[in-house]
Amino acid sequence: ILEPFNHNRKIIGFDTWEGFPGTSSQDPTNIKARDYGATKDYEKYLEELLQYHETESPISHIKKYQLIKGDISNTLQQYLEENPETIISFAYFDLDLYKPTKDCLRLIKGHLAKGSVLGFDQLNDGNFPGETIALKEVFGLDKFEIQRSPISPLQSYIIIK
């Protein structure tokens, strides 16, 4: 978005569009599979929105985004296997749950560079402890300063050093 001429910088979005594929013992007991699904036709709407944005950008003939449907624990692994050149500059986790967050953190670890940013929607959130547990297990909490916005207490990020 901030580098409209950099055709190597892409936005890759992963979603089931159908809600959580499942939960684990590290997740709250009040959530279940299929919770938090997207509204009808949201996938199509988002695709149209991204395509419109693309047409308004320089070098609009080169597609710089991709939406991938499915359980990210599987689809991210497949994406990285098919695109081994991937260097991740920014990854945002709004997965809410332990297993997919941990799976993804493990998968992207070798694709991060100094300065890469990992953003989280539910870090240190007692309602969804899975993101915090996964980050703690994969990266540890003593290696990074957790940054937060002063106007939004939920979202946070770390910078790989």
Briefly describe each language-model feature range.
Residues I1-K161:
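S-adenosylmethionine/decaboxylated-SAM
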